[in-house]
Each structure stands twice: as structure tokens, then as C-alpha cells.
Amino acid sequence: MDGDYLKALIVFGALLLSMPLSAAQLDLQLGANSRIWQTEELLKHPQVQTLTVKDDVSYKKDMTYRAVPMAALLGGIKPEDHLQAVALDGFAAELAAAPLLNTQGSRAWLAIEDPAHPWPPLSAGKHSAGPFYLVWTDPQAGNISPEQWPFEVASIKRMAPVAERFPALLPDPALKADDPVNQGFALFQKNCLACHRLNGAGDAQFGPDLNIPYSP
């Protein structure tokens, strides 16, 4: 009996792995222009195109995607706005809107995983970067960091800047704008808050708090 049960579990597991991906949805919370996009709708978007990304940050090789320019999806968003892309695993990328709206130089794209043609796993035993992945063409032109390539994206929200949401994180206001402390804070927002919180401040659920319960 135990042997039969084990065989049944193995067969069931194999069936699950062989099942095609199901369609997903992307929640854009943009105020008056909020919308929930389905995979099929995005794959039929009038601006969707086949895009080759050189040396993809997550896959470490050239990748080809069906993708829509982010600027085409961010209706009503202004360059001075602030956005947050939240992934299924709790990664929360803090993104200035201006680079996402670029139509020249570094350009941001939403890559869409087609359930009929799934992407490869990121590594052995892992998921792919889908269902939605923020990718860039010519990222060097805009000094785009790896944290600005969130994958497994579930939602993109317009939010107040980090400094307004978490004022306790702000450096001393008496410091000059070019002070190393302020420069470090800018890097912290861009590179660290995507995964971590600090003293409970931050939205990411991916990595541990950088100071609680232990100060480094």
C-alpha cells in the first residue's frame, strides 16, 4: 500500500510540473488610471513587440521577450511621480517614474510570459522570471541598477516618495544635498529597500530588517 501511495504522489507531482502555466494578472494602481491587466490582454496590446535584451540581468544571457513599453502602460503618471513594483516574493522595488517614461536612451519594458511558451527557470528548481518582468534596453545609458529589474511582478503602485512615507529614515536636514550621507541615503533607497527594511521602516518582505532585532 505504501509503495502504491508513493507512486501516486510521484505521478501527481509529475503532472503538476507538466501542466501549462496559467494566465496571470498585473495590478496597476495609478489613481484615476488604475487597471488590472490580464496576460492575454497584454500579449495583444497594440504596442507589444518582440524584444531582445542583451545580457539580461536575471538570466545572465541574451533573452527574447514579448514586451510592452512601460510608458504605454503608465497613463497619467508624471516624471516626478514615484512608483513601487511589488513582486510575488515580497521584493518591492522603489522606482522613480522618469526613467520608466523614457522613449529614448534607457527604455523600460514590461516583458510578458506567454503561458503557451513559458520562460526557462532562473536556476535549477526555481521559477521563471514571469509572469511579468521589468526589463531595460540600453540600461547603461541611464545607470540602471539590478534592483530596477524586478521579476515575478504582481503590482505597480503610484506612491509617495520613500522620504515622505518613512521620515524616520531621513538624514539630518542640515546636511547639504551633496553630503556623503545624503548620497548614501539615495543609494539605500535605490538598492537596499527593494529587499530590506530598516528599524521597521520599508515595505519589502523579501529580506530581513537591517537593524532589528540585531544591530550590525
What function would you assign to each model-found segment?
Residues M1-I10:
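Bacterial N-terminal signal peptides that target proteins for export
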Residues S18-P20:
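N-terminal signal peptide c-region/cleavage motif recognized by signal peptidases
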Residues A24-A160:
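Structured, non-membrane catalytic/scaffold regions adjacent to prosthetic-group chemistry
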Residues Y65, P69-A72, D179, Q183, ...:
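Extracytoplasmic/secreted proteins, especially bacterial periplasmic and envelope-associated proteins
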Residues V162-L187:
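Electrostatic cytochrome c docking/interface patches
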Residues G184-N199:
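The canonical Cys-X-X-Cys-His
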Residues R197-P216:
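Gly/Gly-Pro-rich "capping" loops immediately C-terminal to redox-active cysteine motifs
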